[in-house]
């Protein structure tokens, strides 16, 4: 079957840069779906996206649908004709349904059948609907109308190119009649651009100063920004999201180096970086020590004959924003950070839980409780907790919300607070996302855990549990943050006691009954998904969860040990034995004795197992004391042979009550050794 290349380009006013890639990908996906539904084959696909256009190129697209056969089965033959061979209403109705005379129906089989060959339609007749459906299905949060038209799209449409081979596909979509003329750069080539063929699309636009390939523009910007940064003896800060956004803003990227006055470097560099990145879309430069340089890179959308004019314009635009940041910083520093606390008394944290000031006081007490238990200083943690929310009422954070914690750090430093106290004001918000940086100080870790735990206990205490995708207080993230800090920083904190302490801080504001258990379950349940992401089988998680360890670090150490145990050749058999023993013990009548009496042994295999258990118990006691769980399980794996021999030769439920009870005690002792690490029976 013959094939031709297909190109569709929708021209618009400037598209939202942050959603440009997602719109383009969805456009391609919609066209792929339409082609698949129509049974049209092709050899390759490519999507293009620029500020004023979305385009898809399909290579070697079949020129026509394949013919297809359709078989329709009707009523059984005996129901289609009466005894005299005359057609019944069932037969006549089937023929009418097929739109043919009964004579055209196949009557040779057990059922009437009508076979029809449906000729494939020309691809050109199918493409308009495929393209239109794809555009209508784009993930656009809010569509707009323009002029007096009824059509809606993310931005007003301006032109439409649709070529199949060398021919224009005749159609009208979103108020635009298809043609072969695109448009070039607004300034370099404001005239229409004739697209010679689908394959020539990129080169035709390149000649008109438009780089339609998003990835090409992104690579050009990234490479040139790095080159310019090196020339300035610095390193560019290039967040992927900012790079994507800038690539979505320009059709012909030209990076240029600009500068600002060095006096602004007295302002916390995070504030300067925030305003330059978020508001101006600039790439900031750092020196070898990670300090901000008084220069930045802007990406122009024009190759100017006078780049100095563009540079001067950007420097003029950024100056007021930097001046604002400087003003807020100086205003805030006129008073000590601690004085901002009073303003927080009028800022509501949550209506039922009190003000942000109340929260800071709770965090202070909880951090002081946590700190010495993880090796930190209680007084410094208490101080950091008390100051933790002060910067929320500062001018700087009011203008730049992203500076919360960071501003507090600089103000605390200026006030002469200890370094770890100042750092804790920023580290309280760590980790700020999945895989993000963790606190570097024990004071910071204590405050970070306290802040998150206070939120969890408080919100759970008033019954506002997260449901489905709704989690307005980010409780899942808070729980994961606590776990990451404790596990990855190897901090051994008893969460059971800590949560109880946190509950007590709220007094009558919450309902304490069962609250601690509810919060603990929520926190430890987060570990299930964490381990699944790491490739740990859920059975391993459940085997440890059954023991309800109080420490997240201890929980993790047990999981790692069980994960290693599962790889041992004895693991499956011992898991099955533990399950068998667990079932036997659950059916035991009365209480099981705590001690084993060798005098009731009447089988050599009982003696062998008892001796092996004694030796194993003696060997793993020092391991258990040091939480060497992997070593403990490896040692217990050596019990497989005496355990197997015991069950092959010994009837546990002996007729003699003393013998039977003693065997239960022996098995209970065996199971207890494994339960020192995890419930291995759940691995089976």
From Swiss-Prot:
| Subunit relationships | Tetramer of two alpha and two beta subunits.
Determine if Cytoplasm is one of this entry's keywords: yes
Which NCBIfam families does the entry mention?
A: glyS
Q: Which SUPFAM superfamilies match?
A: HD-domain/PDEase-like (SSF109604)
GO CC term, one of those recorded: cytosol
Q: Which InterPro entries match?
A: DALR_anticod-bd (IPR008909), Gly-tRNA-synth_bsu (IPR015944), Gly-tRNA-synth_heterodimer (IPR006194)
Q: Which PROSITE patterns match?
A: AA_TRNA_LIGASE_II_GLYAB
Q: What is its EC number?
A: 6.1.1.14
* Example of a GO MF term: ATP binding
Q: Where in the cell is it found?
A: Cytoplasm
Q: Which domain of life is it from?
A: Bacteria
Which GO terms fall under biological process for this protein?
Answer: arginyl-tRNA aminoacylation; glycyl-tRNA aminoacylation
Q: Does the keyword Nucleotide-binding apply?
A: yes
Catalytic activity annotation: tRNA(Gly) + glycine + ATP = glycyl-tRNA(Gly) + AMP + diphosphate
The text of the family note is: Belongs to the class-II aminoacyl-tRNA synthetase family.
- Pfam name, any one: tRNA_synt_2f
**Protein name in UniProt:** Glycine--tRNA ligase beta subunit
Print the keywords alphabetically: Aminoacyl-tRNA synthetase, ATP-binding, Cytoplasm, Ligase, Nucleotide-binding, Protein biosynthesis
């Amino acid at each position: 079957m013959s094939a031709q290349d297909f190109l569709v380009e929708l021209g618009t006013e400037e598209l939202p840069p942050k959603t440009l890639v997602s719109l383009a990908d969805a456009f391609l996906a919609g066209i792929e779906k339409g082609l698949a539904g129509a049974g049209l084959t092709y050899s390759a696909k490519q999507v293009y996206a620029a500020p004023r256009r979305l385009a898809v190129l399909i290579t070697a697209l079949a020129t026509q649908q394949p013919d297809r056969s359709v078989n329709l089965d009707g009523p059984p033959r005996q129901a289609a004709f009466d005894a005299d061979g005359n057609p019944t209403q069932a037969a006549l109705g089937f023929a009418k349904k097929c739109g043919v005379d009964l004579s055209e129906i196949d009557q040779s089989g057990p059922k009437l059948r009508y076979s029809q060959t449906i000729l494939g339609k020309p691809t050109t007749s199918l493409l308009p609907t495929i393209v239109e459906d794809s555009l209508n299905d784009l993930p656009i949060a809010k569509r707009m109308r323009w002029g007096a038209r009824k059509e809606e799209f993310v931005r007003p449409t301006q032109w439409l190119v649709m070529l199949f081979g060398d021919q224009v596909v005749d159609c009208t979509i979103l108020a635009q009649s298809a043609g072969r003329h695109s448009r070039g750069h607004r300034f370099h080539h404001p005239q229409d651009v004739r697209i010679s063929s689908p394959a020539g699309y990129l080169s035709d636009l390149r000649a008109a100063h438009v780089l339609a390939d998003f990835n090409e523009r992104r690579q050009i910007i990234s490479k040139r920004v790095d080159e310019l940064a090196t020339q300035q003896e610095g390193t560019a800060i290039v967040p992927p999201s900012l790079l994507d956004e800038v690539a979505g803003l320009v059709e012909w990227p030209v990076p240029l180096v600009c500068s600002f006055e060095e006096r602004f470097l007295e302002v916390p560099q995070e504030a300067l970086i925030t305003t330059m990145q978020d508001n101006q879309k600039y790439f900031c430069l750092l020196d070898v020590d990670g300090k901000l340089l008084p220069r930045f890179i802007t990406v122009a959308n024009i190759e100017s004959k006078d780049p100095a004019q563009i540079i001067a314009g950007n420097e003029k635009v950024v100056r007021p924003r930097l001046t604002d940041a400087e003003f807020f910083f100086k205003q805030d520093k006129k008073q000590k950070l601690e004085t901002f606390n009073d303003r927080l008394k009028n800022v509501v944290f949550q209506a039922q839980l009190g003000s942000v000031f109340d929260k800071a006081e709770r965090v202070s007490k909880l951090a002081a409780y946590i700190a010495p238990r993880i090796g930190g200083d209680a007084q410094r943690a208490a101080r950091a907790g008390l100051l933790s929310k002060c910067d929320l009422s500062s001018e700087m954070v009011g203008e730049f919300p992203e500076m919360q914690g960071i501003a507090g750090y600089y103000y605390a430093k200026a006030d002469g607070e200890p370094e770890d106290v100042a750092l804790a004001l920023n580290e309280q918000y760590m980790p700020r996302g999945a895989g993000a940086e963790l606190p570097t100080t024990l004071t910071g870790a204590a405050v970070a855990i306290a802040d998150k735990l206070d939120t969890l206990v408080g919100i759970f205490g008033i019954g506002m549990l997260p449901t489905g995708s709704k989690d307005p207080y980010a409780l899942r993230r808070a729980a994961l943050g606590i776990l990451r800090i404790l596990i990855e920083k190897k901090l051994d904190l008893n969460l059971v006691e800590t949560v109880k302490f946190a509950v007590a801080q709220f007094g009558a504001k919450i309902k304490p009954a069962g609250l601690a258990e509810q919060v603990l379950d929520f926190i430890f349940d987060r570990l299930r998904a964490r381990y699944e992401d790491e490739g740990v089988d859920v059975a391993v998680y459940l085997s440890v969860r059954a023991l309800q360890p109080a420490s997240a670090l201890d929980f993790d150490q047990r999981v790692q040990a069980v994960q290693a145990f599962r790889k041992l050749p004895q693991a499956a058999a011992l898991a099955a034995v533990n399950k068998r023993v667990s079932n036997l013990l659950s059916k035991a009548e009365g209480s099981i004795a705590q001690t084993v009496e060798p005098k009731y042994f009447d089988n050599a295999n009982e003696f062998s197992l008892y001796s092996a258990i004694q030796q194993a118990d003696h060997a793993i006691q020092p391991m258990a004391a040091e939480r060497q769980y992997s070593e403990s399980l490896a040692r217990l794996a050596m019990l497989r042979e005496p355990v197997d021999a015991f069950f092959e030769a010994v009837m546990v439920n002996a007729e003699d009550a003393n013998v039977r009870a003693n065997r239960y005690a022996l098995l209970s002792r065996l199971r207890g050794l494994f339960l020192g690490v995890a419930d291995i029976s759940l691995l089976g």
